[in-house]
From Swiss-Prot:
It is an enzyme of class 3 (hydrolase). Keywords: GTP-binding, Hydrolase, Nucleotide-binding. The gene is gch3. It comes from Saccharolobus islandicus (strain M.16.27). InterPro entries: GTP_CycHdrlase_3, Nucleotide_cyclase, Rev_trsase/Diguanyl_cyclase. Catalyzes the formation of 2-amino-5-formylamino-6-ribofuranosylamino-4(3H)-pyrimidinone ribonucleotide monophosphate and inorganic phosphate from GTP. Also has an independent pyrophosphate phosphohydrolase activity. GO terms for molecular function: GTP binding; GTP cyclohydrolase IIa activity. The keyword Cytoplasm does not apply. It catalyses: GTP + 3 H2O = 2-amino-5-formylamino-6-(5-phospho-D-ribosylamino)pyrimidin-4(3H)-one + 2 phosphate + 2 H(+). Belongs to the archaeal-type GTP cyclohydrolase family. One of its GO terms (biological process) is biosynthetic process. This is GTP cyclohydrolase III. Its EC number is 3.5.4.29.
Length: 230
């Protein structure tokens, strides 16, 4: 699988130049440029995992190196600092992002040609979480969501996957297609979490299919998982 690691260069130095009354401004600018990055990424059929904001990951199977270069140039035009990128390859998203990260730290920047793989996207949703807000505080609900995020992250890490919190009670994960059965085994009898699985040629398609799967689970109300494949 192919993962593009993106590092915002001198990001900390940029934030410090904004003065002491800066946290609100940092959040404003971060959200503004992330909105633009999401828009650009969607045009190239991928999806940014924003993680730390100053370091991003993208699953880029199904995208040529030429397209990646165009996408990176488009992003650079909309960021307040420079960016450094590196393309990593591995049998799993976790291995691929590790290789991409090592590449960034070694100051390499050449894009090698790698074989494209199908992508498995996972759209997780917590059952009854919205309803539970009637009986708990906003912050306690957030703590529960955070704890589940940690548990899901650890599980996916063990099978070579990566995870991003989407907001609300939703999470987005990526695994290799070889690990899909492990996900199904884990959540087939789970009455707390449902997972929509999508398999596609690129990240955007896989995510769309995962969301389609999740909607079918919600409509069915009997299954905890469903899979759609391109």
């Amino acid at each position: 699988m192919k993962v593009l690691a993106i590092k915002l260069v001198d990001y900390r130095e940029w934030t410090e130049r904004l003065g002491y009354d800066r946290e609100w401004l940092i959040q404003k600018i971060q959200n503004k440029f992330m909105m633009k990055i999401h828009e650009i990424a969607s045009q190239y059929s991928t999806f940014p995992l924003q993680l730390r904001f100053d370091n991003l990951l993208m699953i880029v199977d199904g995208i040529t190196n030429t397209q990646l270069i165009y996408m990176i140039n488009d992003m650079q035009e909309n960021l307040p600092v420079g960016i450094k990128t590196c393309l990593g390859y591995g049998k799993t998203p976790l291995e691929a992002q590790w290789n991409a990260s090592v590449c960034l730290n070694n100051k390499e920047d050449k894009f090698k040609e790698y074989v494209d793989e199908k992508i498995a996207a996972l759209h997780f949703d917590i059952n009854f979480n919205t309803e539970a807000l009637k009986y708990t505080s906003v912050y306690d609900s957030f703590l529960e969501i955070t704890n589940i995020y940690v548990d899901l992250s650890r599980f996916l890490y063990k099978i070579g996957g990566i995870l991003q919190y989407l907001g609300g009670d939703n999470y987005l994960g990526f695994v290799s297609t070889n690990s899909v059965n492990k996900v199904i085994e884990k959540f087939s009898d789970d009455n707390k979490i449902k997972v929509g699985i999508g398999i596609g040629q690129n990240a955007r398609t896989a995510i769309k299919l995962a969301t389609t799967s999740l909607e079918k689970i919600r409509n069915n109300r009997e299954k905890t998982w469903h899979i759609e494949e391109e």
